[in-house]
Amino acid sequence: MMSRTLRNTVARDKLAWKHIEQIRRRWNGPMIVKGVISPRDAVLCREHGADGIILSNHGGRQLDHAVGPLDILPEIAAEKGNMKVIVDGGIRRGTDVLKAMALGADFTLLGRPFLFAAALGGKTAVEHAIKILREEISRDMALLGVNSPSEIDSSFIKRIR
């Protein structure tokens, strides 16, 4: 896309669900929509041809009182149909990954732990952070009594208010 076209397309007052349909018609590859934080929008993404959605409140920077992705995840997972649900935000350690999976996520994204590792120690620190995350997931799965991430479901979650 030409920069002027892109600039004109992303103006807040010009974006509409029809743009998702237009992209879908032109793009045969997987199409994932980021920034979804409501079940209604998840349904609209599915209806307009998205293959997946990324639950994200953009780190709370843009709307600091928006619901957190893990808090709304069960409602969105119930509406996902064939779409993949990816969680971005609030994932810091292995237990967060497993929690997201139990609540219905297909994938999780992690940024901050690796950003901090890179800032503090470069490639070696990032490799170490990845090792820690893998070890946490492996250990916590063992503590839950499961051998595979596919065994994790909502029965492992108890919400206490």
Q: Locations of the language-model features?
A:
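Alpha/beta enzyme core
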Residues: M1-V87, T95-F116
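Alpha/beta catalytic cores of nucleotide-metabolism and tRNA/nucleoside-modifying enzymes
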Residues: D71-R161
